[in-house]
Amino acid sequence: MSRYRGPRLRIVRRLGDLPGLTRKSARRAYPPGQHGQNRKKRSEYAIRLEEKQKLRLNYGLTEKQLLRYVRRARRVTGSTGQVLLQLLEMRLDNTVFRLGMAPTIPAARQLVNHGHVTVNGRVVNIASYQCRPGEEIAVRDKAPSRKLVENNLQYPGLANLPSHLEFDKNKLVGKVNGVIEREWVALQVNELLVVEYYSRQA
């Protein structure tokens, strides 16, 4: 399954706010479609599926990519759900987004893919790169790169910088000081239901 490229507000109306996908909020509180207001009682499977879709669409992942992250999380000691969120939050595209360099994760991914971002002084154009504590995430020292990010900083995606990050707006340099804590994950999701969804596949 490829990344979602359709209308974003339809997804937000169905799943709730997805801060990584879009800054817009749905005006209507019910899902799209002719029968959107007449929701039947959902099965446990449908609830788990919805939580999985939230996670996948918010971080802009394919089905295969998310399954790989679940498998990686299972191999790490600790709560699989929490480790899964940490792996996704520490991706380079998400870190660029959380630093405020881009208004959404898709926009941050584009910055990374086009070579506008450096890690410890070297250009890294792999959006899935896992950021580690102590690393410096900066805008490439080129006029087009700086102009892009300076424009983005006027309309940040999220107001609050997570406690594990710091960012110098004048130098356009950020630093990863640790691993994100659960309370700083902006997406409202039940990660345990996502792990349960994949329990037979991972």
Swiss-Prot record:
Native source organism of the sequence: Trichormus variabilis (strain ATCC 29413 / PCC 7937) (Anabaena variabilis)
Known partners and oligomeric status: Part of the 30S ribosomal subunit. Contacts protein S5. The interaction surface between S4 and S5 is involved in control of translational fidelity.
Similarity-based family: Belongs to the universal ribosomal protein uS4 family.
GO cellular component: small ribosomal subunit
Highest taxon above the source species: Bacteria
NCBIfam families in UniProt: PRK05327.1, rpsD_bact
Region of interest (Disordered), ranges: 22-43
Short name of one Pfam family: Ribosomal_S4
Function: One of the primary rRNA binding proteins, it binds directly to 16S rRNA where it nucleates assembly of the body of the 30S subunit. With S5 and S12 plays an important role in translational accuracy.
Protein name, as recorded: Small ribosomal subunit protein uS4
Membrane spanning residue stretches: none
SMART domains for this protein: Ribosomal_S4, S4
GO biological process terms, semicolon-separated: ribosomal small subunit biogenesis; translation
Annotated GO MF terms: rRNA binding; structural constituent of ribosome
Iron-sulfur is among the record's keywords: no
Domain S4 RNA-binding as annotated: residue spans: 90-152
Keywords for the protein's UniProt record, in alphabetical order: Ribonucleoprotein, Ribosomal protein, RNA-binding, rRNA-binding
Entry keyword Repeat: no
